[in-house]
Curated annotation (Swiss-Prot):
Assembly behavior: Interacts with ORF34.
Organism: Human herpesvirus 8 type P (isolate GK18)
Signal peptide coordinates: none
Name recorded for this polypeptide: Protein ORF24
InterPro entries per the UniProt record, alphabetical: Herpes_UL87_C (IPR004285)
Length: 752
């Protein structure tokens, strides 16, 4: 069995009319495109069965072709009974028919005669001047256009109206309809009106959304999927377990409430009884900052997406943001039993449209047809990558690992003009909140405190291992949340260790996400021999009166320079910290008067990199003297760097004492006096870091080596000449601490 090729104009014959279909479940979009192309252009769709292929076929005369398709759609679908003499043509099978019909022979010639058959040729009525007809135009009669695509499906008038709106505006559609209605005989006008309203069937059921109306079950599953997807963006913190469980339980148990809330207008308040919603919202505010909702006790006025929470004590007002629109719905489902309307039926104000809004929305829909973008395949592909990037920028779960490592990275390495610098994290000031367990005993705990002001520190703890301090602030309900302030230094593992230790002496149930309030870093310039350059002769610095440092301020950030070329930087970390240091050190290291010893810079930067700690006073002095002695004796200074690379001068941060012990502890050895500021020598106390922890050989040589009166001036003279500072021979054994007259050799004086 084979189908008759088409589209083909059938000769006038008896036919049966069919009712227009607005819902065709078996009709595919490709078949509707093929039918429309045949109605408009009298030819098959040569290209792909897509909108782009249809555009190519309609390109010569889109308005004329679209109007011809409208006229044929208004005449409707028809069925012509036929018989094929050879019995090989395929047709639609229907009821038995006896009467005049079409007889088709083996050569495809049509004749009319009496037939008895149940086969029909599907066609569409046509009243066109362009039809291939032997009669003059004034003697036109209704013809039929046979379409092979109608053998497997029917015409879906909703789909046809969507395709028509692609090529015509609505006023053009109306003009085409009325012009065609004026030339038709009165006998065809009822059919025309019936098919006209079938085309406009989609305008009877208006919707705010772009998506077509879904079935109730599909809409309920769609809401559940959106709720689950939205909750998945919150992260998986233990404090949100009860909130997730309450939402999931109520969504499955109370689907009617879910439907009511989804249909509720954004300008209508949701009334809730009880304070559970306030507790859930406080926890979510702490954990997901992008979803923060302000909880107010004063009425904020008429605002969209408002929730009114009534408690025995007072009334709370929560105004949810419009994006995402499902936010208020999800939070209200957590307390679905406490919502102040009936759970059995729809809410009285849960309808989308009022009676007076239908004409306005219909006019807006017709106006939107005029300016709507065409649904071409290229335009239908959204840029999902850009959407994901915008979402990822605000989602706490997608915080990049590189950002976390920058925040908790203990060291940063910078190379500027082949000068190596290591930046150390001194400490971080971290703010967060904790929720505590309810005490089960009558003993005094952290929770048994009187009512105080909110900014009052009620407890302060200092931990030795791992080293950090914590301050606990007052809170009205410490079981729900209290603020803590942590001062700590170290990497991510050190921080997690500290948080675990914190749970050993505080009744902590959950720790909320932390935020770094301040960040302090420090660095030493190793190898810069004239260290006074960082604090003298500069116009962009100012001295502080209450601290012995000079502050350089650039781009709103301060760099404090202490003696011996040591600097501290606050409020910045990661790559911005590196850029700030580059801008700060570039004028110093590139100055023509700067004297830099590359060997010392490589040795000390290597030790800092190996030991992950700043070089202490005794280490610094010992290695400075060792380097100068090797240089004075014409020995290879590079051997010291090779020895440092093999670990000969390594030290550990753990051997540094954490307390300022008395001077008696200092005589026990290096292990005890490394960071102790004073030692007991020659019946007096002497500060080790009086000249600065990073003081170089030129700075501290005047205060040491008193027993080598003959050798010391020679080594000092050699060091000054090596640096090109034009040493004047004024230093003798008797007055070796007297500063030179030449201002260019001020570096031999101790820097204060």
């Amino acid at each position: 069995m084979a189908a008759l090729e088409g589209p083909l104009l059938l000769p006038p014959s008896a036919s049966l009319t069919t009712s227009p279909q607005t819902t065709c479940y078996q009709a595919t979009w490709e078949s509707q495109l093929e039918i429309f192309c045949c109605l408009a252009t009298n030819s098959h769709l040569q290209a792909e069965l897509t909108l782009e292929g249809l555009d190519k076929m309609m390109q010569p005369e889109p308005t004329f072709f679209a109007c011809r398709a409208i006229r044929r759609l208004l005449l409707g679908e028809r069925l012509h009974p036929f018989i094929h003499q050879e019995g090989t043509l395929l047709g639609k099978v229907g009821r038995r028919y006896s009467g005049e019909g079409l007889i088709i022979d083996g050569g495809g010639v049509f004749t009319r005669g009496q037939i008895d058959t149940d086969n029909y040729l599907p066609a569409v009525g046509s009243w066109e001047l362009t039809d291939d007809c032997d009669k003059p135009c004034e003697f036109r009669e209704l013809r039929s256009l046979y379409l092979p695509a109608l053998l497997t499906c029917t015409i879906c008038y909703k789909a046809m109206f969507r395709i028509v709106c692609r090529y015509l505006e609505f006023w053009e559609f109306e003009q085409c309809f009325h012009a065609f209605l004026a030339v038709l005989p009165h006998s065809l006008q009822p059919t025309i009106y019936q098919n006209y309203f079938a085309l406009l069937e989609s305008l009877k059921h208006l919707s705010f959304s772009i998506m077509p109306p879904a079935s109730p079950d599909a809409q309920l599953h769609f809401l559940k999927f959106n709720i689950s997807s939205f909750m998945a963006t919150w992260g998986w913190h233990g404090e949100l377990v009860s909130l997730r469980r309450a939402i999931a339980h109520n969504v499955e148990r109370l689907p009617t409430v879910l439907k009511n809330l989804s249909k509720q207008s954004k300008h209508q308040d949701v009334k809730v009884n009880g304070r559970d919603l306030v507790g859930f919202q406080l926890a979510l505010n702490q954990l997901v900052s992008r979803l923060h909702v302000k909880i107010q006790r004063k009425d904020p006025g008429p605002k969209p997406y408002r929730v009114v929470v009534s408690t025995p004590d007072c009334t709370y007002y929560l105004v949810y943001p419009g994006t995402p629109a499902i936010y208020r719905l999800v939070m209200c489902m957590a307390v679905a039993d406490c919502i102040g309307h009936s759970c059995s039926g729809l809410h009285p104000c849960a309808n989308f449209l009022g009676t007076h809004e239908t004409p306005r929305l219909l006019a807006a829909t017709l106006s939107r047809i005029r300016y709507a973008p065409k649904d071409r395949r290229a335009a239908m592909k959204g840029n999902l990558q850009a959407c994901f990037q915008r979402y990822a920028a605000t989602d706490a779960r997608t915080l990049g690992s590189s950002t976390v490592s920058d925040m908790l990275e203990p060291t940063k390495h910078v190379s500027l003009e082949n000068f190596k610098i290591t930046i150390f994290n001194t400490n971080m000031v971290i703010n967060t909140k904790i929720s505590c367990h309810v005490p089960n005993t009558l003993q005094k705990t952290i929770l048994n405190i009187p009512r105080l002001t909110n900014n009052f520190v009620i407890r302060k703890y200092s931990v030795k291992e791992p080293s950090f301090t914590i301050s606990v602030f007052f809170s009205d309900n410490m079981c729900q949340g209290t603020a803590i302030n942590i001062n700590i230094s170290g990497d991510m593992l050190h921080f997690l260790f500290a948080m675990g230790t914190l749970k050993c002496f505080l009744p902590i149930r959950h720790i909320f996400p932390v935020s770094i309030a301040n960040w302090n870093s420090t660095l030493d310039l190793h190898g810069l021999e004239n260290q006074y350059m960082v604090r003298m002769g500069r116009k962009n610095v100012f001295w502080t009166t209450n601290f012995p440092s000079v502050v350089s301020s650039k781009d709103g950030l301060n760099v404090s320079w202490f003696k011996a070329a040591t600097a501290t930087i606050s409020k910045v970390y990661g790559q911005p910290l590196v850029e700030q240091i580059r801008h700060e050190l570039a004028p110093i290291l590139t100055d023509q008067h700067a004297r830099i010893d590359g060997n010392k810079n490589r040795i000390f930067s290597l030790l800092e990199h190996r030991n992950r700690s700043q070089i202490q006073t005794l280490h610094k002095r010992f290695l400075e003297c060792l380097v100068e002695c090797c240089s004075f004796l014409r020995l290879d200074v590079a051997c010291i760097r090779r020895a440092a690379a093999r670990g000969l001068f390594d030290f550990s941060k753990k051997i540094i004492s954490h307390t300022k012990s008395k001077h008696e502890c200092a005589v026990l050895g290096y292990k005890k006096c490394n960071l102790i500021p004073k030692i007991y020598a020659r019946n007096k106390k002497t500060r080790l870091d009086e000249l600065g922890r990073n003081a170089n050989f030129i700075s501290f040589v005047a205060t040491t080596g008193h027993r080598f009166a003959a050798l010391k001036p020679q080594i000092v003279r050699h060091a000054i000449r090596k640096l090109g500072l034009h040493w004047r021979h004024r230093t003798a054994a008797s007055n070796e601490q007297t500063p030179p007259a030449d201002p260019r050799v001020r570096c031999v004086r101790p820097l204060v």
